[in-house]
């Protein structure tokens, strides 16, 4: 009767599969930079390999988990190694899905641009546009869209920065104003002096308004 594989043996397989996954992810990411209108055979192959190897790694981790659960005296270092393998698997799944999504988004955008190009060509002439011209148009439109997105991002960033500066300056002015008022209130007689100045200004304004009114009435009755 064959004995069950040890923790070290199964962990060695997990490490080997992790290395293979990283190599496949590196190859798979190149398709996001050179996306074609349709999925190539090589892209399909790597996509399928990644799904398969990630599934194998889950089986390996399940085996390691079973060994740890069945052995209460398992060392803390092995439990830590198992936890790390789980984290790496989650990270690789996340990277795989992100790359796949990026490839699909880029492919959809290229197909949309190509469709627009064909519609424009069909509306002007019945002759099909040369493939070289279509590729050049797609590349130019892609660059133009990227440049527009960069400009919008910069404008939004500048707007938020300006808003933050205004908010910061407003807080500084409010703080300074509060400090001045607090300081004036601590100085004896300052509040009374300010009240007297305001009262005197009101009296002067009242006298000036009265004189102006009398002059207008005098001119009105003597004209």
Swiss-Prot record:
Keyword Cell wall biogenesis/degradation: no
InterPro entries referenced in this protein's UniProt entry, alphabetically: Golgi_SNAP_su1
Coiled coil: none
Entry keyword Phosphoprotein: yes
Vesicular side: 223
Organism per entry: Saccharomyces cerevisiae (strain ATCC 204508 / S288c) (Baker's yeast)
Disruption phenotype annotation: Lack of late Golgi SNARE proteins, TLG1 and TLG2. Spores are temperature sensitive and fail to germinate at 37 degrees Celsius. 10 to 20% of cells possess a variety of aberrant structures, including fragmentation of the vacuole, a common occurrence in secretory defects, and substantial accumulation of membranes in some cells. These structures are considered to be abnormal Golgi remnants. Endoplasmic reticulum (ER) retention defective, erd phenotype, which is characterized by hypersecretion of ER-resident proteins. This results from a defect in retrograde directed vesicles.
Subunit structure of this chain's protein: Component of several multiprotein Golgi SNARE complexes. Identified in a Golgi SNARE complex consisting of t-SNARES SED5, YKT6, and the v-SNARE SFT1. Interacts with BET1. Interacts with BOS1. Interacts with SEC22. Interacts with PEP12. Interacts with self.
Lineage, broadest ranks: Eukaryota, Fungi, Dikarya, Ascomycota, Saccharomycotina
Protein name: Golgi SNAP receptor complex member 1
